[in-house]
């Protein structure tokens, strides 16, 4: 028996042991964990420093280092996310509907756990805690497989969670970490149909594509963030400037950062110089512009076809000038990763049309795409942002980690 199968068996058994846990027990434990994270900050930072040192040795960019880095403030924010999950209403056992049918059977449809969730993710160590807290609150066991660049951080975080579970009299196998970073073991997890009820990949395009191709277990696809901002003919250009700067430069390495800028030709000649001047005072950006946009910049390079479909995760942005709202919507729907999209406009009808017709999990009017986040949406720490339409879409909070079951009660009923 392989290590992966042993781990899967333990997770399956743990899912049965934690299935009956009450809301009170779960919330009390999550509050305990939130405190333990803060109390153990120095240990967690020391482990993270090992990952940062390894990343530096391998020439990882500053932007990607930021995804990997833990700080005291970030650990405090992770702990706050755990506490927020504790404070949320428990969906498990929630009655979705109840009725008596024509045969006199009493039928209830309730929310129940999924069972065992597997999570494959990349650099960010906070995902370990975020994913566990949501899985635990919904009575699911979870198997975590992080990237090798965050292995020391993930080991320290999962060790803390397991120790906290054990101290609380709860099976520590409710969370398990796959420490082997090999692709072979990852593929074994993707195909563990005997143990894994659902797999959630969270990372870049290559990871998502690999999971889609290799997985035999059900997958909830979380998306790459090829995110666009459309500046409409009726846009307030001051607001547009502020939003583009925020969405592109605040944290370019995250999936809700903007990667593409689409501008109506009626405002392009005014807006582009205005934006370029303002953004250069904050953080210069490399503009990859189409033929109409290129001469309007002081500094830009001609866009290649692949630039319009790339999640840069860097201070780089593609630029497209369009002649109508319809062309903007068509362009965005061609290149979107179905994550988050935004329109800047004072035209209410244009805003409504954009929100109705753009195919994305979150569609904004006059706001930065950086708000697409489970914590911001009031869902607690998110397990990922789903870009598919089946089961869950957008930031996935507690309900996304549940299924439903029908409970039918009779009194000797038989079907004639």
Swiss-Prot record:
Annotated InterPro entries: Ald_DH/histidinol_DH, Ald_DH_C, Ald_DH_N, Aldehyde_DH_dom, G-glutamylP_reductase_CS, Glu-5-SA_DH, GPR_dom
Q: Where in the cell is it found?
A: Cytoplasm
In short, the EC number is: 1.2.1.41
One GO BP on record is: L-proline biosynthetic process
Q: In which pathway does it act?
A: Amino-acid biosynthesis; L-proline biosynthesis; L-glutamate 5-semialdehyde from L-glutamate: step 2/2
For this protein, the record's Pfam families field holds: Aldedh
Reactions listed under catalytic activity: L-glutamate 5-semialdehyde + phosphate + NADP(+) = L-glutamyl 5-phosphate + NADPH + H(+)
CDD domains, alphabetized: ALDH_F18-19_ProA-GPR
In which domain of life is the source organism classified? Bacteria
Q: Which GO terms describe its molecular function?
A: glutamate-5-semialdehyde dehydrogenase activity; NADP binding
The answer to whether keyword Cytoplasm applies is yes
* Keywords, sorted A to Z: Amino-acid biosynthesis, Cytoplasm, NADP, Oxidoreductase, Proline biosynthesis
Has keyword Transmembrane?
A: no
Q: Which SUPFAM superfamilies match?
A: ALDH-like
A single Gene Ontology CC annotation of this entry is:
cytoplasm
Q: Which HAMAP family match?
A: ProA
Q: What does this protein do?
A: Catalyzes the NADPH-dependent reduction of L-glutamate 5-phosphate into L-glutamate 5-semialdehyde and phosphate. The product spontaneously undergoes cyclization to form 1-pyrroline-5-carboxylate.
Task: Please give the family membership noted in the entry.
Answer: Belongs to the gamma-glutamyl phosphate reductase family.
Which protein, by its recorded name, is this? Answer: Gamma-glutamyl phosphate reductase
Biological source species: Streptococcus pyogenes serotype M1
Q: Which gene encodes it?
A: proA
